[in-house]
Amino acid sequence: MQDSSSALESYSDVTLIGAGIMSGTLGAFLTELAPEKSLAIFEKLSAVGLESSNEWNNAGTGHSALCELNYTEQKADGEVSVERAVKICEDFQLSLQLWSYLVETGRIQAPREFIHRIPHISFVQGEQNAQFLQKRYQSLAQSHLFEGMQFSRDHQQLAQWMPLMMQNRDSNETLAASYIQYGTDVNFGELTRKLFDYLVKQKAELNLNHTVKNIQRLANGEWKLTVVDQQGQKRVHRSKFVFIGGGGGALPLLQKSGITDGKNVGGFPVSGLFMVCNNPEVIAKHNAKVYGKAKLGAPPMSVPHLDTRFIEGKQSLLFGPFAGFTLKFLKQGSVLDLPTSVTPTNFCSVTKAGIKNLPLAHYLMKQAMLTKAQRMADLREFVPDAKDEDWDVVVAGQRVQVIKGGEMRFGTEVIRAEDGSLAALLGASPGASTSVKAMLDVLVSCFAAELPQWQAKLTQMLPSYGKALRNEPQLYAQIKQRVDQVLALAN
């Protein structure tokens, strides 16, 4: 992909800030639904998908709540609530449907380059956790969305599901796992690159090495963006609609826009590390994404998992994440990001959230100070035979947790102008996996007048659009069969 040359002043109907999975997804929607709209993208780095969307900067899990225990809460009476898990599963099905549509119609090619079938496993230790996992399994198994899920405490069965993790285990240790065959590993970096290749072919204007410095509302309702390129050349760009999809960099731009709903919003950055295996023999012994349970007092983003990944054309094995304390909102950001994001309008909210979350800050600082030996000790809870020399540390991406109303939010959130002319996506997990649902929310809230004429096309692209798949077993079966075939997941 090459930079677009442009004059000192320019215009587009739609402007996307940040060339990650969110902007790529919204761009694909609008290109299909409204091809007459001109589209411009501004990305401050030298290529698309280099920050949170990059394959080395996220876990690559197709988050559909098949194995992630933090999506199923155990209530005070001991029962397990699966509502959030069902919702996330439905949302991920929308992502699979859009990707299938884009492959089926030739918009993007070679699905095996960005998605693979991989079993998803939940793994716990101890009797109390085993009972929780069994209740979770029993609740989820009642839904056709989780059909085929299995549960076992038997060490021999567990050894078939995850042989690397069961080597040299104490035969008397209480263990339990749930297993489901049709999970996915998604290379969101490769998918992002494919999406932007498609957008450029459809005449979208991609501007790499261009930083948006300011956003202002004009009297005619348009937005004026001040943009600076790598050489320091300033440019003014006007647009009817602006989407800020710059990951951690979205918050400062949202604040500059001056929209009402963005004034009280703050952000708290969290960095991440993974251990990556460098021994091909060890990598070959594991073929699953195995999620554990966060330790008592640890935040939701700390759920440990041992992941088979497919990166740069080969199978990899990663363990983590290990969180860290940082002031940066982006991996290639500035230590001034957090301090300068605190404004008179969000000071009270950020301060209140900070006081409430002092244990989180303490946890992050402790995580940042871990030695390799301490990280290896955590890994050995999953892989008892893990050898120091087989594992290296890789720095992952940044996430910025949304602070709103004095509370820290752990999901993703769309903030928009009252008239729908500007929207920004903030937050983290489940992130890229539910990018399609997040961008559908943008379409619904920002293009309400045009939505009726898009209904037929949206239903063609997303057969479950407007329906709750939890109540549609036959439709779900049809969609799953099509998705598996088109995305080459059936074998």
From Swiss-Prot:
<keyword id="KW-0560">Oxidoreductase</keyword>
<dbReference type="InterPro" id="IPR036188">
    <property type="entry name" value="FAD/NAD-bd_sf"/>
</dbReference>
<dbReference type="GO" id="GO:0008924">
    <property type="term" value="F:L-malate dehydrogenase (quinone) activity"/>
</dbReference>
<comment type="pathway">
    <text>Carbohydrate metabolism; tricarboxylic acid cycle; oxaloacetate from (S)-malate (quinone route): step 1/1.</text>
</comment>
<comment type="similarity">
    <text>Belongs to the MQO family.</text>
</comment>
<protein>
    <recommendedName>
        <fullName>Probable malate:quinone oxidoreductase</fullName>
        <ecNumber>1.1.5.4</ecNumber>
    </recommendedName>
</protein>
<keyword id="KW-0285">Flavoprotein</keyword>
<keyword id="KW-0816">Tricarboxylic acid cycle</keyword>
<dbReference type="GO" id="GO:0047545">
    <property type="term" value="F:2-hydroxyglutarate dehydrogenase activity"/>
</dbReference>
<keyword id="KW-0274">FAD</keyword>
<dbReference type="GO" id="GO:0006099">
    <property type="term" value="P:tricarboxylic acid cycle"/>
</dbReference>
<dbReference type="Pfam" id="PF06039">
    <property type="entry name" value="Mqo"/>
</dbReference>
<dbReference type="InterPro" id="IPR006231">
    <property type="entry name" value="MQO"/>
</dbReference>
